[in-house]
Each structure stands twice: as C-alpha cells, then as structure tokens.
UniProtKB/Swiss-Prot annotation:
Organism for this UniProt entry: Bordetella petrii (strain ATCC BAA-461 / DSM 12804 / CCUG 43448)
Signal peptide: none
Keyword Methyltransferase on entry: no
GO biological process: L-tryptophan biosynthetic process
EC primary class: isomerase
Entry superkingdom: Bacteria
Name of the molecule in the record: N-(5'-phosphoribosyl)anthranilate isomerase
GO molecular function, a single term: phosphoribosylanthranilate isomerase activity
Catalytic reactions of this protein: N-(5-phospho-beta-D-ribosyl)anthranilate = 1-(2-carboxyphenylamino)-1-deoxy-D-ribulose 5-phosphate
InterPro entries: Aldolase_TIM (IPR013785), PRAI_dom (IPR001240), RibuloseP-bd_barrel (IPR011060), TrpF_fam (IPR044643)
Length: 220
C-alpha cells in the first residue's frame, strides 16, 4: 500500500505548487480564525483554482457555525471537510460532503487505546479518522503523541482509514509509518519555515521519506 500525503495550512500559491510537484495527494486550507494559518474564503477560492485534478482540497474547521461551513462549500468547493474541534457525528454529516474527523489524541477521555477507539466508533460515517496530538491549541503544534494509543483503533476491523498527524517531519515520518501503517499522513508545521510558509525543500524531503518507508514495508 502507498501512504498518501496531505500538506495542510497552505496560504500561498507557490507552496501549493511545491506540494503538488513533490507528489502530495491533498492540500489543506485552515478556516479556523484562531490559527496562524487561517485563510479567508475569498483567498482560498483563488488558491483552489491552482490545484490540479486528482489532488484533493480539504477545508479544516474547528467548531464552526454552519453558515461559515456552507460559505466555504459554496465559494471554495473543497473535496473534503476536516472537523478538528468538538463536533458531533451529526454536525459533521449535516452538509452532505465527505468529511474527516480529527481526534486530539491524549486528551482527557482519549488517553487510552480503549477510550480512543470507542470515541472513534461514533464517527463511522467519516471518510477517515485523523489523529493529532493533544495541546492547548488546535493542530499545527509540532508535537507528537504516543502512537501506542492507536492500538485499539488499529485492531478495530470496522475502523475508517487512519490518518496520522502530530509532529511529523522528514526525520520521523518513516518510523511513524512503519509503526502505525496509516492510510495517510497529514503534515503542516513539519514542512514550514514559519507558520503558513512552507519550505519546498522540506516538502520534498518529507515525500521522499514517505516513499522510502513504503519501499521498506514492501521489502524493496
């Protein structure tokens, strides 16, 4: 299996081009005003037009007002919505658009393999479950979490595709892939020079590290 790669927190056209040229499968726009990577829907709509076919656009929200989500759906037309706050399963599904549900792994109530797996099961309609590290903020913290907490999810035959995030970069993503065998990895701060400013060299190095890990798993 090939590990898919999403580069999140894009704010500049040049960074989208770098991600696409390196082979990223998806790019993410952050619509959470509290983030340093926040983009206005008008800008995201312009940037979205530079994304070629067969590269997914993901819109990230944190506890949004329904009108704000609908505005992004209308203006930007993302392929997927990523919910990164405290949204219920019904709130995630209400828009009729494929969605990812993020879990702040290690947070109270999500701090054992059993508790985490149980929380995930409520979101069985999701296109994927994304696991990020728990911190005071939401996403892009650059912090890793104990991947042993995913044991219950990985053992669940009904689990949705596992998307690994949280403190990933070119130096550690290979080890994480070999340990967790995720469907995809989601990286933001690990390929940045500053919040919202991606490094082409770091993006290329990350994609190379992912491919090398996949080759090792295939015995190549």
């Amino acid at each position: 299996m090939r590990t898919r790669v999403k580069i999140c927190g894009l704010t500049r056209e040049a960074d989208i081009a770098s991600a696409v040229q390196a082979g990223a499968d998806a790019i993410g726009f952050v619509f959470y005003p509290g983030s340093k990577r926040y983009v206005q829907p008008v800008l995201a709509a312009r940037l979205r037009r530079t994304v070629p076919a067969f590269v997914d656009v993901v819109a990230l929200f944190v506890n949004p007002a329904p009108a704000d989500v609908q505005a992004v759906l209308d203006q930007v037309g993302p392929d997927l919505i990523q919910f990164h706050g405290d949204e219920s399963a019904a709130e995630c599904a209400r828009y009729g658009t494929r969605f990812l549900r993020a879990f702040r792994t290690g947070a109270p109530g999500l701090d054992t393999p059993g508790n985490l797996a149980a929380a995930c099961r409520a979101y069985d309609a999701a296109a994927g479950w994304l696991f990020d590290s728990y911190s005071a903020g939401y996403g892009g913290s650059g912090q890793a979490f104990d991947h042993a907490l995913l044991a219950g999810v990985r053992a669940d035959a009904a689990a949705r595709p596992l998307i690994l995030s949280g403190g990933l970069n070119a130096a550690n993503v290979g080890t994480a892939i070999e340990a967790c065998r995720p469907w995809a990895v989601d990286v933001s701060s690990g390929v940045e020079t500053a919040p919202g400013e991606k490094s082409p060299d770091k993006i290329r190095a990350l994609l190379d590290a992912v491919r090398q890990a996949d080759d090792r798993l295939r015995g190549l």
